[in-house]
UniProtKB/Swiss-Prot annotation:
It comes from Pongo abelii (Sumatran orangutan). Residues 21-32, 33-35 form a propeptide. This is Tissue-type plasminogen activator. It is found in: Secreted, Extracellular space. The gene is PLAT. Inhibited by SERPINA5. Inhibited by SERPINE1.
Length: 562
């Protein structure tokens, strides 16, 4: 187990009358990844940051005094000032507001359990409810383990959400780096600095609903289930066992209740390890082991960002909005190097779905490469994952004339039982329940690296997304598709907007084959179709045709079995 982290804090005792001095609690930081370096002040107690020449009030510990501070060249100059009660309420959660006597700055004296400029931060919140829109806790770590950036950082000034917005307090944003969900995404998130730039990432904040589950989310910090066996099959020791005297994480820990420890032997993760664990006796020796608690599925969850650029046939997109999208490359026998072949869909750690017609050349498996987590088709992504192919399975009844049974499975090669590692840009899509029947004209999404239009000689350089609607079966017939065969294993979807010859209708196109058609179902993006074929690209009143995934669930599961 990791040793308990300990921190030391130096407190400066301020004595005597009013005079200015540099604060020992506030240090200079130089932010990275910007065009120029900027010195700022950071309060180590509150984690608040202040720009050059910015002023603020702060209470003095163990005193009724209030100080006025000013950030000057990375050092805070502070002195005591007289205050009075605020003329209007500005503090939440029972906080007491005091305003400087001679200027408008104010400070809130917060009750126990609350912090922040306006006492808006709930320091006791350990998990989030629903989507976490109302979450006001102090979790500040992203799923990748990166530390969140302060919402007031000048590096975020041009981002859509920062602590400088007029409605920042209402959204939970401010001078802190805690996870929030200001845009009603699927869960709390924050900005992190990675690979020389700031980008948004979901947080590892535990969901309150996962506490009593039979599985765990993230690393299982909030797991409160009743599993009590380790991966080796050993029984966990009671957390209050006398054998554990001297250990840090026991039922005697001062924070035992908050950590989920007590008079039981259930698996827990009190120290933020990789997953739930417990103490065990092995060969008469006290040790610890990870537990056999399964990880909860996060299929179909994503960090969706609104596309900024409209292009022919759809919209440019980021891979984080479609983290199940795969790019399949092939080495052809008669040409050097790898070439983009088709799209694919991540449905489990080691399995990719695609279209059967992509593999009509019968490539040897070692000539295929699958890339996950890539926004630009031929430009490596910062967090992409690349795999060789162990084998691929094309449906035995695939008809290369009608494209009936246009489905294939690729198994990724790995030295372990796991292949793709879940991240904000790599995640599985949910397979549909067998009885899923979505209403006609349901709006869904497709994604891929295909051409912008049918006559284009080039594939898209960047991932695209398109929004289409499911056609009723009465409109998905040969009569509507120039007498091409439309089998029961197919479904149709298209852009139903009206428009003239110049209308930019969304649709799949050459190169998108094998990619996903996903629809929202029970709060998760669910795979409904596999991009298969069509007549042209983006033709008015002409839908695209997709392999109907619900018809192949047994085939998928049978072929994925060891």
């Amino acid at each position: 187990m990791n040793a308990m982290k300990r921190g030391l804090c130096c407190v400066l005792l301020l004595c005597g009358a009013v005079f200015a001095l540099p604060s020992q609690e506030i240090h200079a930081r130089v932010r990275r990844g910007a065009r120029s370096y900027q010195v700022i002040c950071r309060d180590e107690k509150t984690q608040m940051i202040y720009q050059q020449h910015q002023s603020w009030l702060r209470p003095v510990l163990r005193s009724n005094r209030v100080e006025y501070c000013w950030c000057n060249s990375g050092r805070a100059q502070c002195h005591s000032v007289p205050v009075r009660s605020c003329s209007e309420p500005r503090c939440f959660n029972g906080g007491t507001c005091q305003q400087a006597l001679y200027f408008s700055d104010f400070v809130c004296q917060c009750p126990e359990g609350f912090a922040g400029k306006c006492c808006e931060i709930d320091t006791r919140a350990t998990c989030y409810e629903d989507q976490g829109i109302s979450y006001r806790g102090t979790w500040s770590t992203a799923e990748s383990g990166a530390e969140c950036t302060n919402w007031n950082s000048s590096a975020l000034a041009q981002k859509p959400y920062s602590g400088r917005r007029p409605d920042a307090i209402r959204l939970g944003l401010g001078n802190h780096n805690y996870c929030r969900n200001p845009d009603r995404d699927s869960k709390p998130w924050c900005y992190v600095f990675k690979a020389g730039k700031y980008s948004s990432e979901f947080c590892s904040t535990p969901a309150c609903s996962e506490g009593n589950s039979d599985c765990y989310f993230g690393n299982g910090l909030a797991y409160r289930g009743t599993h009590s066996l380790t991966e080796s099959g050993a029984s966990c020791l009671l957390w209050n066992s006398m054998i554990l005297i001297g250990k840090v994480y026991t039922a005697q820990n001062p924070n035992a209740q908050a950590l989920g420890l007590g008079k039981h032997n259930y698996c827990r993760n009190p120290d933020g390890d990789a997953k739930p664990w417990c103490h065990v006796l092995k060969n008469r020796r006290l040790t610890w082991e990870y537990c056999d608690v399964p990880s909860c599925s996060t299929c179909g969850l994503r960090q969706y960002s609104q596309p900024q650029f409209r292009i022919k046939g759809g919209l440019f997109a980021d891979i984080a909005s479609h983290p199940w999208q795969a790019a399949i490359f092939a080495r052809h026998r008669r040409s050097p190097g790898e070439r983009f072949l088709c799209g694919g869909i991540l449905i489990s750690s080691c399995w990719i779905l695609s279209a059967a017609h992509c593999f009509q050349e019968r490539f040897p498996p070692h000539h295929l490469t699958v890339i996950l987590g890539r926004t630009y088709r031929v430009v490596p992504g910062e967090e992409e994952q690349k795999f060789e192919v162990e084998k691929y399975i094309v449906h035995k009844e695939f008809d290369d004339d009608t494209y009936d049974n246009d489905i294939a499975l690729l198994q990724l090669k790995s030295d372990s039982s796991r292949c793709a590692q879940e991240s904000s840009v790599v995640r599985t899509v949910c397979l549909p329940p067998a009885d899923l029947q979505l209403p006609d004209w349901t709006e869904c999404e497709l994604s891929g690296y295909g051409k912008h239009e049918a006559l284009s000689p080039f594939y898209s350089e960047r991932l695209k997304e398109a929004h289409v609607r499911l056609y009723p079966s009465s409109r998905c017939t040969s009569q509507h598709l120039l007498n091409r065969t439309v089998a029961d294993n197919m479904l149709c979807a298209g852009d139903t907007r009206s428009g003239g010859p110049q209308a930019n209708l969304h649709d799949a196109c050459q190169g998108d084959s094998g990619g996903p058609l996903v629809c929202l179902n029970d709060g998760r993006m669910t795979l409904v179709g596999i991009i298969s074929w069509g007549l042209g690209c983006g033709e008015k009143d002409v839908p695209g045709v997709y392999t109907k995934v619900t018809n192949y669930l047994d085939w998928i599961h049978d072929n994925m079995r060891p």
